Amino acid sequence: MRDGLEELRQEIARCRICRDAPLRGFEHRMPHEPRPVAVMSAKAKILIAGQAPGLRVHQSGLPFDDASGDRLRQWLGVDRQAFYDRDRFSILPMGFCFPGYDAKGSDLPPRRECAPVWRQRALAAMPQIELVLAIGGYAQTYHLGRQNAGMTGTVGNWRQYLFTNASTPVLPLPHPSWRNSGWLKKNPWFEAELLPVLRLTVDRLAG
């Protein structure tokens, strides 16, 4: 008999809700075949809560299998082998599938169908999680509530969120996209203060 987590994995892999039952009507259905990408684990203590897969991840089926992933792994202080070890990290984007591009060629936001259907079930199936890394605004809004502080304000308050008495602390991070390279240069405290604590925490929970 499959355990509950494995059954949930298979349900998510079969999900086509954004194609077959889009929230805003069929004119807004997913323009391509969905390919849900998520990594759920009964052992990993760290949950990486991302945004949505990009095209390269859609093609490979591996989360963060791109330049953003390379930067994220550098932030975490882990190599690819450790990053894709289910016993170390669970990876649960806000939208499981590549949402497509907008008119300017940028990735669309995560599909709105995913989180209401799957997120609470997925989180409940992983009660061992001790830290959520909330990457980008969509994940931060879900896990922290709407902050109205922008990325700088939210990530800048990382100590407040990480060293909280909550059962599962949340550490907000900017998206590791190249588009945020300018922000990283303007905010040197991120590399000087936050990243050393992040790496120590990752080593403790996933080392």
Predicted regions and their residues:
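A polyanion-binding, active-site-adjacent surface
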Residues: 2-206
